[in-house]
Amino acid sequence: MEEALRAMLRAVPAVSGLVATRVDWGIAPQGQVLPCLTLTVVSDAPVDHSLDGPGLSQARVQVDCWAATYAQAKALSRAVRTALDAWQGGVIAGAFLASARDLPDDDGVTEIHRVTMDFIINYHFG
């Protein structure tokens, strides 16, 4: 699922036009150019009651859209939402937006803007 999600986001022109290949699981590399995306698995569990048969899992994936300005972060979040909401393909049985929030990330040194979205990802495990 992780590989498929990252590859899909990098392949969508509306997303890659803003971040190129700057889509990373966990944390962005030190000194990462903005804008960029980080992806985090918040939870992941098998779905035992699936009509799709064994091997279906459901993950909550947090997608953080980082940018130098709020407008850039919001534009990136809209591109990601358009790409991911209701997407299915390959191992991904379905992806759906669960929540979104705007969060500043002010460490006192640099001002970075962030829009965070949680997606429910149903996928075929294994």
Roles of regions detected by a PLM:
Residues 55-68, 73, 113-123:
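Oligomerization/assembly interface segments of phage tail-like spikes and tubes
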Residues 35, 59, 101-102:
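Short beta-strand or tight-loop elements
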Residues 24-26, 38-40, 64, 98, ...:
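Residues in well-ordered beta-strands of folded domains
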Residues 1-53, 71, 75, 82, ...:
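Small/polar-rich, solvent-exposed N-terminal microdomains that initiate assembly or binding
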Residues 82-126:
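Acidic-leaning, charged glycine-interspersed low-complexity segments
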